[in-house]
Amino acid sequence: MGARRLGRELALQMLYSRDYAAGEAAPLLELVLDESEPGAAAGRSFADDLVRGVLEHRQEIDTAITGASKNWSIGRMARVDLSILRMAMYELLFRSDIPKNVTINEAIEVAKKFGTEDSPAFINGILDEIASTLPDKG
C-alpha cells in the first residue's frame, strides 16, 4: 500500500474516532498506525496533514459538502462517508499538489474498504459535483 493511501486510511480512522471522542486526534494516531507497515512514516505525516487540515477548515468544508449534497444534510450522512468526504474536500480545496481525479479515485477506494455498499457512489456523486466547480490544478 502506498504512503498516501495509508495516510488517507489513517486519517479516516482518526476523523471518524474524533467524532465520537472528546479530545485530540493525535493520540489516536498511535492506536491506528502499525509502525512496521511499509511507508508508515510518510503515511503518518500525510495523515497528520489531512486531519489537521480538515479540523482547521471544517466549516468551509462542511459548507461545500452541504451545497453539493442534494436532499442530504450532514446530520443524515453516515459518519464514515462524512469523514471520507471531509478528507477529500480538504484535498480538493487546499492541496494544489494532488490532482482532482486522484483525490476522487482515492476517496472512492477508501469508501469501498470502510463504507457501505452505497458509499462509493454517494461519495463519487458529491465529489464530482464539487470538483466540476473548481478550477483545474496545475
UniProtKB/Swiss-Prot annotation:
Similarity remark: Belongs to the NusB family.
GO CC aspect terms: cytosol
Biological source species: Geobacter sulfurreducens (strain ATCC 51573 / DSM 12127 / PCA)
Highest classification ranks of the organism: Bacteria, Pseudomonadati, Thermodesulfobacteriota, Desulfuromonadia, Geobacterales
UniProt protein name: Transcription antitermination protein NusB
HAMAP family: NusB (MF_00073)
CDD domains, A to Z: Terminator_NusB
Biological process annotations from GO: DNA-templated transcription termination; transcription antitermination
Keyword field: RNA-binding, Transcription, Transcription antitermination, Transcription regulation
InterPro entries reported in the protein's UniProt record: NusB-like_sf, NusB_fam, NusB_RsmB_TIM44
NCBIfam families: nusB
Job of this protein: Involved in transcription antitermination. Required for transcription of ribosomal RNA (rRNA) genes. Binds specifically to the boxA antiterminator sequence of the ribosomal RNA (rrn) operons.
Annotated GO MF terms: RNA binding
Pfam families, per the entry: NusB
